[in-house]
Amino acid sequence: MPPKRNKKAEAPIAERDAGEELDPNAPVLYVEHCRSURVFRRRAEELHSALRERGLQQLQLQLNALGAPRRGAFELSLSAGGMGKQEQVALWSGLKRGPPRARKFPTVEEVYDQIVGILGDQQESKEQTNTQKSSKIDLPGSEAIASPKKSESTEEAQENKAPTSTSTSRKSKKEQKSEEEPTQVDSKEAKQSKELVKTKRQPKAQKKQAKASESQEEVAEDKPPSSQKRKRTTRSSTDEATAGAKRRR
């Protein structure tokens, strides 16, 4: 029998040809596509070229970066790049779509709009971080310039406060004097009114006393001497007994 021939080692499919030398500062389009049909890979390459023609010339392509793909998969994700380690943002999932097979592939417009939105948000975040850094760098110089201005302003404020405080003290004294004067006038007026009331009440009381004395004198003159009470004579018990004995005799 002829000796058995050893099987030739199958050459690995070059899935990462397009992504051998990736620029970390440029965005990357990751595509996981099924190997059972060549249509999946062709669609991925056509999508990448169409996006570059639309204006995304820095967009890079990476096919099946995680190894063996899933059956019927056509998964798209984007890494914006330029900020160190970037998380992949999912753009499309063909496993959740189909049959028919045509539903597994997105249109160029849908993918383009999503990528532009993600890159625009990243650009805004970069600008914000740059402005914050520049403001932090400028802070020490601005503080040094602002500190003498603050000291000068505080000195001026203190100087302005000194005359204002004296003027306010004078005003307060004047107000106190003006308040005390009307109170004194009011107290004098109250005393005078009380004295007038007393003087008015005294002649009235004297008149009443004179009238009362005159009425008492008139009553005493009008009473006759016969009006005095006469003492009533009462008989004693001994007189009654003697009178009764005389009658019997």
UniProtKB/Swiss-Prot annotation:
It comes from the Eukaryota. Residues 199-210 have a biased composition (Basic residues). It is found in: Cytoplasm; Secreted. Residues 1-22, 122-249 are annotated as: Disordered. GO terms for biological process: cell redox homeostasis; determination of adult lifespan; embryo development ending in birth or egg hatching; larval salivary gland morphogenesis; response to redox state; salivary gland boundary specification. The keyword NAD does not apply. Residues 8-19, 175-198 have a biased composition (Basic and acidic residues). GO terms for cellular component: cytoplasm; extracellular region; Golgi apparatus. The modification Phosphoserine is found at S147. Its main location: cytoplasm. The keyword Coiled coil does not apply. There is a cross-link at C34-U37 (Cysteinyl-selenocysteine (Cys-Sec)). Keywords: Cytoplasm, Developmental protein, Phosphoprotein, Redox-active center, Secreted, Selenocysteine, Signal. Expressed in the developing salivary gland at late stages of embryogenesis. Also expressed in brain, neuroblast and wing disk. May be involved in a redox-related process. Required for survival and specifically for salivary gland morphogenesis. This is Selenoprotein BthD. It comes from Drosophila melanogaster. The gene is BthD.
